[in-house]
């Protein structure tokens, strides 16, 4: 799997990390990431998916309601959030690869309240993998890698490779959170 450490330490941008990568590389990284997410769920039980973890660092600055800003995310919430973000990155990358301008967002997030079982979130990850690989397959044979956009102020410009990689970086940023939630759930189950 790709090392996002230089991005987190602000030593490199997504576009820097994307230099020299191919569409096939992105497909391989996507398979690896989804396999890591599914592996994290191997010992999870349905009750773990809806357990509200202790998360003193919870701070969702994009929450639609003020009371949700400090909400600790359940495992189900994390999975539907991260898959939606990666799918959005894949969709925007497809737009860029086709030589078109990105206008607005391309995001749909399954309501996290629907994520109540391990089977549901496993399916969500598998479905997301299929969707992202399909979007990569839809790239032209010669993608327009000179087509750049800036997602928002303060971010360096990126092309299709950088935009797609951004979704994987986002997935990576939530892997540890998934493991922490599952570990908290395991400890709670053992104590019950």
Language-model segments: what does each one mean?
Residues 1-76, 80-192:
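Aromatic-glycine hotspot motif
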